[in-house]
Amino acid sequence: MADKLETYRAKRDPRRTSEPIPDAEPLPRGDDDTFVIQEHHARSLHWDLRLERGGVLVSWAIPRGLPPDPGTNHLAVHTEDHPMEYARFEGEIPQGEYGGGRMFVWDRGRYTTEKWTDREVKIVLSGARASGRYVLFQTRGKNWMIHRMDPPVPGWEPIPETVVPMRPVTRARVPRDAERYGWEFSWGGLRAVALVSGGRLVLRDASGTEITKEHGWLRAMAESLGSRSAVLDGEIVPLGGNPVYVCSDLLYDDGRSLLAEPYERRRARLEGLELAGPRWQTAPSWPGEVRAVRRAAAEQGLPGVLGKRLDSPYEPGEESPAWVLLPS
């Protein structure tokens, strides 16, 4: 019998990696119904889909993860078979080794097979995060595509291609109902909307022009979000000698538009993302604290403070009185 794991073993040194490397022995018998998806922060973020088949895990690397709807196919690169023990593997593969980087289980569960040939695989996944009918089909060599055959999950909305930022009204006086606003610094930086999907970033300025290449350092933020899709509003600000993306609003979160949600709720979801990295952070906000925030802005030489009504929706492209800019 051919050793299905020969290629797998040849690529790994048991003295250097904690990955399971079983001896060449008879393969365990299973029911060909186990799947696992592992998020793999290697040189390039991707998700490894592994399907139990004939005692091994037949594997594909999917750079953008599973497609959420039938309208989009994603690349799936057929890789070497992995041992069944790999279904439980999580950890750090040493840099310099094959697949070096952090890996963890994104989802696992059962699957049923509708069709399995050398060029096409139709399956139904039943996991905690991944469910539905998918087909994998070969296009050329190791390159396959994965297509979702079922409709998207109820309530899912596609990520927009762009969002033109909402703009504040400049005022000299503090609003009488200042306690109904969340107050934050106006940084005087470059306004930028970040669209993140499948660990990939598209960055646009206030006019909608793409500026991703000019700010490639921010791609690490997109990778830090993993499979979560999001649209963020913020500013690129020079802090500590380097540009930093300061996130101040969340407009779309993992298949759901938040434009109609009140700012207070959007803000809570933004904080839930815990965006904090070497070149990105969440802008602090202080509900009702306008005078203290304005005084601090003046002391730090910032141009002003921005107030957002806690009950206000996000109005793309509009100059709205629901947002107030007060000069320092």
Question: Where do the PLM segments sit?
Answer:
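Catalytic cores of nucleic-acid ligases and guanylyltransferases
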Residues: 1-328
